[in-house]
Curated annotation (Swiss-Prot):
Positions annotated as CXXCXGXG motif repeat: 149-156, 166-173, 188-195, 202-209
Species for this entry: Acidovorax sp. (strain JS42)
Binding site for Zn(2+) 1: 149, 152, 202, 205
J domain: residues covered: 5-72
UniProt region (Disordered), positions on chain: 227-246, 352-376
Record protein name field: Chaperone protein DnaJ
Cofactor binding remark: Binds 2 Zn(2+) ions per monomer.
Length: 376
């Protein structure tokens, strides 16, 4: 049987944001929770959840989503997480709930019974130039990192002492609480789910068993990246608790304002000033591009605002097959600080042009006619 479209499975459009995808998955996870689907409904619910889980795993990962968007199901490995098929069993089913409900309620249950928490995601803003965005680059960044405490060797206990089993939960990290007819399992309030009590905490790490330091990370910026895009570095967020998975690091790209170019998607725009003599008589001018210099032939009688397009002189975006174009917008420059001789020459030129009327200044003549019609 062919697989359904992943966007259809989650009920979201193809341009859905990460938050929309996550919310849709949460809704399905709650709907097909095993506690809500017993008896004959259990098996169909499990299949529905597996389908939603697979869709979420692909669409929540930027690289996998890009491959799926381009090639469909053939672009992603259906066994990338080692168990989408029927052999997964209830263990994998429960593990999948840990991913989503851990986000919702703070943590999932580990195999030893202790509360397992996923680490928090980290964000990092990186500023790059337009040239670096176009070509791509490799950079180093420093981010906070947790390392095992050298004083207590990660135990959290003062040297010479050791952690004790929590007497409240007997080391399980959870306690049973009765609410009417129901018995609810909750995190032990005494040890906070660790199953251990540290009578004498290590003074270096304050009983955490780890200390915060800085680490250097190599980051590859892909060519064509645009302002506001994020790069996900899996597992480089804050570490999890009690064996929980680490969070992710999201690097947000910010592109510095350029002195010459403005970016619009894959296209670039720039303003090119030319003298009114060149605009009137025409000629060749030199313009800058990200690849170097280029020449443009300015035709005779070029007006201010005229736009010239240089194909392929823009930027090739991250998901683009071809580079964009460069648009040069002409600004006709009016001369300033004229000498008396220059003023005289311009006045003579003006008188000569006026005699030609619409022949030399079609826009001015048309404007004059419209004004006469307006005030008449």
């Amino acid at each position: 049987m062919s697989k359904r479209d992943f966007y259809e499975v989650l009920g979201v459009p193809k341009n859905a944001s990460d938050d929309e995808i996550k919310k849709a998955y949460r809704k399905l996870a709650m709907k097909y929770h095993p506690d809500r689907n017993q008896g004959d409904a259990a098996k169909p619910a499990e299949e529905k959840f597996k389908e939603a889980k697979e869709a979420y795993e692909i669409l929540s990962d930027a690289q996998k989503r890009a491959a799926y968007d381009q090639y469909g199901h053939a672009g992603v490995d259906p066994n990338m997480r080692g168990g989408m098929g029927g052999a997964e069993g209830f263990g994998g089913f429960a593990e999948a709930f840990g991913d989503i409900f851990g986000d919702m309620f703070g943590g999932a249950r580990g195999r030893g019974g202790r509360q397992v928490y996923r680490g928090n995601d980290l964000s990092y803003a990186m500023e790059i130039t337009l040239e670096e965005a176009a070509k791509g680059k490799e950079a180093q960044i420093r981010i906070p990192s947790w390392e095992s405490c050298e004083t207590c060797h990660g135990s959290g206990a003062k040297p010479g002492t050791s952690a004790k089993t929590c007497g409240t939960c007997q080391g399980s990290g959870t306690v049973q609480m009765r609410q009417g007819f129901f018995s609810v399992q909750q995190t032990c309030p005494h040890c906070r789910g660790t199953g251990k009590i540290i009578p004498e905490p290590c003074t270096a790490c304050h009983g955490q068993g780890r200390v915060k330091k800085q680490k250097t990370l190599e980051v590859k910026i892909p060519a064509g990246i645009d302002d506001g895009m994020r790069i996900r570095s899996t597992g480089n967020g804050e570490p999890g608790t009690n064996g929980g998975p680490p969070g992710d690091l999201y690097i947000e790209i910010r592109i510095k304002k350029h002195d010459i170019f403005e970016r619009d998607g894959d296209d670039l725009h720039c303003q090119v000033p030319v003298s009114f003599i060149t605009a009137a008589l025409g000629g060749e001018i030199e313009v800058p591009t990200l690849q170097g210099k280029a020449a443009i032939d300015i035709p005779e009688g070029t007006q201010a605002g005229k736009q010239f397009r240089l194909r392929g002189k823009g930027i090739k975006g991250v998901r683009s097959s071809y580079p964009g174009d460069l648009y040069c917008h002409i600004i006709v420059e009016t001369p300033v600080k004229l000498t008396e001789h220059q003023r005289k020459l311009l006045k003579e030129l003006d008188e000569s042009l006026k005699k030609g009327g619409a022949k030399h200044s079609p826009s001015t003549e048309s404007w004059t006619d419209r004004l006469k019609s307006f005030f008449s």
